[in-house]
Amino acid sequence: MALENPKMHNSEISKRLGAEWKQLSEAEKRPFIDEAKRHRAMHMKEYPDYKYRP
């Protein structure tokens, strides 16, 4: 989306992508959710003492 609309602000891109995400079925979302879980587990294994500190 950003490549197709190089002058579009990031906030607008985020809004549009969020709207698209809400339109997806659970089955369409599943691969992304599973991949996020896999990355989370990998990160926890590699950095067991990591604590998010903004």
Curated annotation (Swiss-Prot):
Gene3D superfamilies: High mobility group box domain (1.10.30.10). Its main location: nucleus. The keyword Transcription regulation does not apply. InterPro entries: HMG_box_dom, HMG_box_dom_sf, SRY-related_HMG-box_TF-like. It is found in: Nucleus. Pfam families: HMG_box. GO terms for cellular component: nucleus. GO terms for molecular function: DNA binding. Keywords: DNA-binding, Nucleus. Residues 1-54 bind DNA. This is SRY-related protein CH1. The lineage of its organism: Eukaryota, Metazoa, Chordata, Craniata, Vertebrata.
